[in-house]
């Protein structure tokens, strides 16, 4: 019964999709096709990232990561987060396993939040697209405000959350 409760949201969405298909067949099939394409995208994107996370876990020593992204890393933490998030490719859900590994290895919460923010606003493909579509002024304002915002959010998160508390948190217990 606990396993069924854990997947209740999946079953609710599946039943909703079936009901939608009975009400409006073309819309239901379109939703099913979109869902299938999203699942396929995830299946192609996640395995390489999980392999990368596993290799990073084995190759990068905790002390090295703490030196560059730990509490006392200073400008190195900002630069490393900018580099790691800026050269990234793919949707944000790809960044979460990397962020969890960084947290486990001793990276500061401030730099993890900043890394996730850089991933969403200032990764290279987004910057190139914004420069070509929206121009220099918009892009620089958007990225500048985004980076400042996410760094400040990282400072706030660091004040309210303990690293050990986040490492012990298990989201599946709430399901």
Identify the residue ranges that each predicted region occupies.
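Juxtamembrane and boundary regions of transmembrane helices in multi-pass small-molecule transporters
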Residues: 2, 131-175
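Hydrophobic core segments of alpha-helical transmembrane domains in multi-pass membrane transport
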Residues: 12-21, 50-55, 150-154
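Membrane-embedded alpha-helical segments and adjacent helix-loop junctions characteristic
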Residues: 28-89, 93-98
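Membrane-embedded alpha-helical segments of transport systems
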Residues: 88, 116-128, 145-153
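Hydrophobic transmembrane alpha-helices of multi-pass solute/ion transporters
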Residues: 1-44
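Hydrophobic transmembrane alpha-helices that form the pore/transport pathway of multi-pass ion
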Residues: 91-117
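Juxtamembrane helix-boundary/capping and inter-helix hinge elements in multi-pass membrane proteins
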Residues: 72-74, 101-111, 132-136
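Hydrophobic alpha-helical transmembrane segments
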Residues: 7-11, 43, 47-48, 75-79, ...
């Amino acid at each position: 019964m606990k396993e069924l409760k854990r997947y209740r949201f999946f079953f609710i969405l599946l039943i909703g999709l079936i009901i939608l298909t009975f009400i409006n067949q073309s819309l239901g099939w379109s939703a099913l096709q979109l869902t299938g394409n999203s699942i396929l995208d995830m299946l192609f994107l996640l395995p390489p990232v999980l392999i990368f996370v596993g290799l990073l876990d084995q190759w990068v020593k905790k002390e090295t990561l703490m030196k560059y992204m730990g509490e006392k890393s200073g400008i190195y933490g900002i630069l490393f987060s900018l580099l790691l998030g800026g050269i990234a490719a793919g949707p944000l859900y790809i960044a979460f396993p990397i962020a969890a590994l960084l947290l486990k290895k001793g990276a500061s919460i401030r730099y993890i939040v900043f890394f996730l923010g850089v991933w969403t606003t200032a990764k290279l493909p987004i910057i190139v697209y914004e420069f070509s579509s929206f121009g220099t002024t918009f892009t620089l304002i958007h990225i500048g405000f985004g980076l400042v915002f996410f760094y400040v959010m990282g400072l706030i998160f660091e004040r309210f959350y303990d690293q050990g508390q986040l490492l012990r948190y298990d989201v599946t217990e709430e399901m």
